[in-house]
Amino acid sequence: LDAAVAYDDSLPGMAGDYLRYNYNRIVRRVYQGENSSGIYYRFVFEISYLSSYEQELAVEEKVQEILSELNIYDSDRETQIRNIYAYVTGNVKYDNMIYETFNVHSAYAAAIEGKAVCQGYSLLLYRLLQEIGIKNRMVPGDAGGVGHVWNIVEMDGRWYNLDATWDWGT
């Protein structure tokens, strides 16, 4: 369990699980060649992300705007978590039919467009909680045989499940 919830307090909100679950695909290639020194290998990694640099700047600005709007910096941890969770579930709609306009798996879709699938919900929730120093992780799994992701959050030494996708609109 300790390894599953390992947490690095020094990471900013855009690192850690946010970075891990914000890539679209990784292509790995290995090339072998030979020169006068002998055989060599060249490893090439191509990483594509769910959002562009410009979109991430917009997400960062929106995260700061949301936290300022919620005015929770002086609140206790439970109130902070509840208010952030209520914001996400009340302002993001589940929509998997909008693939042509933007990537519904991204925090950008959730924060800026207000429509996302579970990954977008979880990425936005992760960013908001992480930004104010609340330990949380993203958990991949499945729901009824379909891929799903949700968050866990640490409070008073215990970890709790948060699934903003299933609570949207509440």
What kind of region is each of these model predictions?
Residues 39-53:
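Short, structured interface segments
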Residues 1-42:
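Intrinsically disordered, low-complexity N-terminal segments that are enriched in acidic
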Residues 41-45, 106-109, 113, 158-164:
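Short, well-ordered strand-loop elements centered on a beta-strand within folded domains, enriched
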Residues 1, 54, 112-116, 140:
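Alpha-helix capping and helix-loop boundary segments enriched in small/acidic/polar residues
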